[in-house]
């Protein structure tokens, strides 16, 4: 029972990111050649090329969109939009911000529910990521780091991490070099989270990074990560399995909960549940690489260590409404799916904080809802990003869906 005399305790999510602004433009091959950019690849460019590239795009009026980016930044924004609640973003921010600058653009495009008070000030620019799209739709990425990788370990607030519902990091944070301190800062936060039993959520971000050393990433996940988010390409890179269900299953060897977005195939989730808490689905059993894999999808996911007799549970949701008629943007769909999963995880922590004696918490579950419910929610949230241009939601989901009412289809 809820104690109404006391003030409700709040739960929140913390994320670490390279603070970056996404700049999108349409270009041709000659433009890529001029700036020595390899088509279809992601490459880091120095500040001179960055400034020349940006000036050229501005001069020729080629920029289509300029908005706040970053995998974890997008996830925090979307979490706060869906949950209408606080998240905390850690990273760097330019100390002096001019109106109209990239840093200004980042602040403007981030939900007011995202707490930016813990950002570390730096004397210089934040990151810029150019997405250059040619006439065939192929995307070429050019990244200018600025000072985005200069988050210091001492800027990580231990108490903030220890009281979080989850800590969200991305694989990009491990790609620092020279005098950049982002990797050390991230590992400091991960250590605080691991020691305090706070779930660490890793989003893989790009297959190219994982392909360089899949064994290292598998070991990292095994040692530090509780929830893994990936798409089918990243799943193939880290597990060696092309089938998203088998990739998610393999990842369960190392972690407790897996989210795998698989484009037009929809979304797969895999997790553990104790045999005594398993719940059979009421939906038809699905065929696949694992026969009847969704049998226990009505179960709530648990950490493997909390299970006396762990069994694996899987769920799959096909694209909402069959997928959008036209996909405006695939960038950020996975981030939005993860934000929905985090919303459910945080709701569970919130309920536990305020209604600790609820029968709901006799099962030490990680999530409030079943795998099937979360999979549907994550799938629905990612659809919202696919039909708009920005990877960031501008509003939460509707309370009721017209398309779920029979009358909608009778029209």
Language model: regions and residue ranges:
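Ribokinase/PfkB-type carbohydrate-kinase core domain
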Residues: 1-42, 63-67, 71, 86, ...
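Active-site alpha-helical elements of protease catalytic centers
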Residues: 66-88, 335-339
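Glycine-/proline-rich flexible loop or hinge segments
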Residues: 52-63, 82-90
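Active-site gating loops and adjacent loop-to-helix segments of metal-dependent hydrolytic enzymes
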Residues: 35-59
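The catalytic Tyr-X3-Lys active-site helix of short-chain dehydrogenase/reductase
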Residues: 333, 337, 374, 378
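Short, threonine-centered small-residue motifs that mark membrane-proximal processing/anchoring sites
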Residues: 328-331
């Amino acid at each position: 029972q809820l104690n109404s005399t006391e003030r409700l305790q709040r739960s929140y999510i913390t994320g670490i990111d390279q603070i970056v602004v996404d700049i999108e433009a349409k270009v041709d091959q000659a433009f890529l050649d001029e700036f020595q950019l390899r088509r279809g690849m992601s490459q880091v460019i120095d500040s001179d090329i960055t400034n020349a590239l940006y000036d050229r795009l501005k001069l020729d009026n080629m920029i289509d969109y300029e908005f706040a980016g970053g995998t974890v930044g997008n996830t925090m924004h979307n979490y706060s939009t869906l949950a209408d609640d606080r998240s905390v973003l850690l990273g760097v921010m330019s100390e002096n911000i001019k109106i109209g600058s990239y840093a200004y653009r980042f602040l403007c495009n981030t939900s007011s529910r995202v707490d930016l008070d813990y950002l570390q000030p730096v004397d210089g620019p934040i990151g810029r990521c150019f997405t250059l799209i040619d006439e065939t739709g192929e995307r070429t990425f050019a990244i200018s780091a600025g000072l985005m990788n200069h988050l210091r370990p001492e800027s990580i607030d231990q108490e903030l991490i220890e009281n979080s519902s989850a800590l969200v990091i991305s694989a990009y944070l491990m790609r620092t070099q020279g005098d950049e301190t982002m990797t050390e800062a991230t590992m400091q936060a991960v250590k605080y989270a691991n020691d305090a039993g706070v779930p660490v959520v890793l989003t893989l971000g790009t297959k190219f990074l994982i392909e360089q050393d899949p064994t290292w990433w598998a070991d990292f996940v095994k040692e530090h990560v509780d929830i893994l988010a990936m798409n089918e390409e990243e799943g193939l890179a880290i597990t060696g399995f092309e089938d998203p269900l088998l990739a998610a299953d393999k990842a369960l060897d190392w972690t407790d909960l897996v989210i795998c977005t698989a484009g037009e195939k929809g979304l797969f989730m895999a997790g553990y549940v104790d045999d005594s808490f398993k719940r059979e689905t009421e939906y038809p059993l699905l065929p696949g690489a694992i026969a009847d894999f969704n049998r226990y999808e009505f179960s709530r996911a648990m950490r493997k260590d909390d299970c006396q007799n762990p069994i694996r549970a899987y769920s799959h949701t096909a694209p909402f409404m069959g997928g959008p008629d036209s996909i405006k943007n695939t960038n950020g769909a996975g981030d939005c799916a993860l934000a929905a999963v985090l919303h459910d995880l945080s709701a569970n922590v919130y309920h536990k904080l305020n209604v600790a004696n609820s029968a709901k918490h006799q099962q030490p579950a990680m999530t409030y809802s079943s795998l099937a419910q979360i999979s549907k929610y994550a799938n629905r949230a990612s659809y919202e990003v696919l039909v708009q241009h920005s990877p960031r939601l501008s509003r939460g989901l509707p309370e009721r869906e017209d398309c779920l009412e029979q009358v909608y289809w009778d029209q």
